[in-house]
UniProtKB/Swiss-Prot annotation:
Annotated InterPro entries: ACP_syn_III_C, ACP_syn_III_N, FabH, Thiolase-like
Protein name: Beta-ketoacyl-[acyl-carrier-protein] synthase III
Recorded GO MF terms: 3-oxoacyl-[acyl-carrier-protein] synthase activity; beta-ketoacyl-acyl-carrier-protein synthase III activity
Lineage: Bacteria, Pseudomonadati, Pseudomonadota, Alphaproteobacteria, Rickettsiales
Species whose genome carries this gene: Anaplasma marginale (strain St. Maries)
Catalyzed reactions per annotation: malonyl-[ACP] + acetyl-CoA + H(+) = 3-oxobutanoyl-[ACP] + CO2 + CoA
Catalytic residues in the record: C113, H249, N279
Annotated segments matching region ACP-binding: 250-254
Entry's EC annotation: 2.3.1.180
Amino acid sequence: MRRSVFCGVGAFLPAKVITNDDLSLMVDTTDEWVFRRTGIKRRHVVEEGDTVSCMATEAAKIALEDAGVSATEVDLIIVATATPDKTMPSCATMVQGSLGCKNAAAFDINAACSGFLYALSIVDSMIKAGQANIALIIGSEAMSKVVDWTDRSTCVLFGDGAGAFVFKGQDETEKPGAGVMSTLLCADGSLGNVLYTNGGVASTGKAGYICMKGTVLFEHAVVKLSSAISALLESSALDVDSIDWFIPHQANVRIIDLVINRLGLSRDKVILSIDEHANTSSASIPLAMYEAKRAGRIKKGNLVLFAAIGAGITWGVSLLRL
């Protein structure tokens, strides 16, 4: 049986940092207020010259080096982003051109904060079907470009950055047990007004700003993520104690805590980077994975659980054996 095996991870963060104290000079807030409600201390934001495709390219370079893979070996690139540089061409083709991945198909997807897991599921399916062998998945976002910096309910939440994974197709006998074990993707378009931007190319001609019904989204996030995780574990004949590490979308530490409490999962098994990165949408999971691997926390053979929820609303969960 053919499996999608994780081989490398990379990340990129813009140099500019905005702390909660910096924000207190812009809107009516304090470091204590933001941290207590979200777990966020600071966020990285793009400056002139930092584009989503450039950040994606830099993260991809590190991931390819980590995997020991050359650019010409890559045959699939998917970029998950809700903040592309242009309507067209896609960020993925820009990355392909910058890296010299001349043998790779390339396209973008947009499932907002769930985008990286949607991309992971597509890559897994294509590798298993024999349509790709070495794939690059990138989540890259410039959320600061769609934030109203006068709205304290949203501007404190988001940051910019990029993260990337490399996957290889391998036979089960080559690396027994390793690879993407299972994925569950979900959506509920009736809740599209819970989190959205008030603009778009065909509607207003402008990107617009993020609008959010925070309390409603919070409640749905806790219920939907915990339910999806339970369903995935049950279908995989696993219990929560089987999980070595949980890497959730880094949206709000209170959501994460409520989810793990519902599941009975130890906080010691949760990888958090929200304090340093804030909510980087589709980039948050690979950014957290990169930091955990660099710190030596995540090891070969570990079972890692991913979970994310975002605008749409969309949500997804995935199990990966390293």
